[in-house]
Amino acid sequence: PTDDPEINALRDRQVRNVLATLFFSQGIPMLLAGDELGRTQQGNNNSYCQDNEISWVDWDAAAKHSDLIEFVAALSALRRAHPVFRRRRFFSGQTGDSVDGQRDIIWLTPSGHEMNAGDWNSGYAKALAVCVNGDAITEPGPRGERITDSDFIILVNAHSEAVRFSVPASIGSPGTAWQVIVDTGSPQPVAGALDPAPASSAETGGAGLGSAGLGGSALNLEVAPRAIVVLRGAKPAG
């Protein structure tokens, strides 16, 4: 335990990073009771025999960690609202029968180049971007209907310094407007995640929350140290 505000702020951010990684991953998200309250078991990952404060859920912590509870609720709502995060089939990395002719998933380096084997095996790489295509969901809905969703870009920066990402204009449907809906490095990490937030320039520092850029030109965002930024693409009408 520590009273150092910088250390505690970093720990809180890392908690948000792990939760965001969980909720925006495919498969069933698994939470241990109390994760949404900041319950850590004091680092004990095998506490089955600890019938004491290590393993008990301290419900009084709910008031102290209300912001974390709200963050988890917002992530859960976003996941529930967007089937691209709940696919029942594996990604193929191919176009398949996507409406827009783009692949279902693309992995990029911060400079905007598609990742290759060397990038994946690099020992010093601490940042990447993943783009998931909402028009490339291959499984049908419960009535056999086609499932479509928004496109998403997830920027991950595990570095101790800020990293600038460049996403090529070819990502997403032509004319797509990108909105930052989650920024774990922000004091309000999900402001605007469910309701649009005021526009915020991506060229003047951190990612911010709100409108980040339009399709047709490269998207440039600076992601804070040890932070995750999620962008949702709004396709043009028609």
PLM region spans:
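Carbohydrate-interacting/catalytic domains
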Residues: 2, 7-16, 21-238
